[in-house]
């Protein structure tokens, strides 16, 4: 009789970035499969889990979402410690949130130097209505940051379910050192999806 027992692996993923950029929406959309228009601002830390099965292994994503207001920065260690991946998130429609990534990255790396970094641009559905030159400028800056961070870069929209599942597939591939088979998307104006081979 075949052994029916499954291996269980838990992967802690931290989500950080400025407030009101869509961190909680991404987490809820991924875990529950639906977009919540009424998502409220996170005060402190949010936490959700989602378990998926791959072959004979059950993988639980333990997702930690830090409220983006500066008064919660003292909770950053709770989100970063033991995380195997950190999603550094910004709102594609607000350039100031991309500029903040440098400081978030610096602080997070103080608590965790080994987590796989992924740079996530949210609200792609708003971004795609921007003039072409604005899209080019923001994409160029995001690529510069991703390169400096040695991070994969993904633009997503939780309200339109664009690239949400793929973010966590990239996390899996990077954490377990698997070949990422998701096709990359590189054209400005499209929902960018570029990953680096570690």
Swiss-Prot record:
Tell me, what is an example of a GO biological process annotation in this record?
Answer: positive regulation of mitotic division septum assembly
**PANTHER family on file:** PTHR47978
Could you cite one Gene Ontology molecular function of this protein? signaling adaptor activity
Q: What is this protein called?
A: Septum-promoting GTP-binding protein 1
Q: How does it assemble?
A: Interacts with cdc7 and cdc11.
Q: Which UniProt keywords apply?
A: Cell cycle, Cell division, GTP-binding, Mitosis, Nucleotide-binding
Q: Which domain of life is it from?
A: Eukaryota
- Region of interest (Small GTPase-like), ranges: 6-198
Q: Name one Pfam family in it.
A: Ras
Q: Which residues bind GTP?
A: 17-24, 65-69, 122-125
Q: Which Gene3D superfamilies does this UniProt record tie to the protein?
A: P-loop containing nucleotide triphosphate hydrolases
Q: Name one GO cellular component term.
A: mitotic spindle pole body
Q: What is the role of the protein in this entry?
A: GTP-binding protein essential for the induction of septum formation at G2 and pre-START stages of mitosis. Acts via the cdc7 protein kinase pathway.
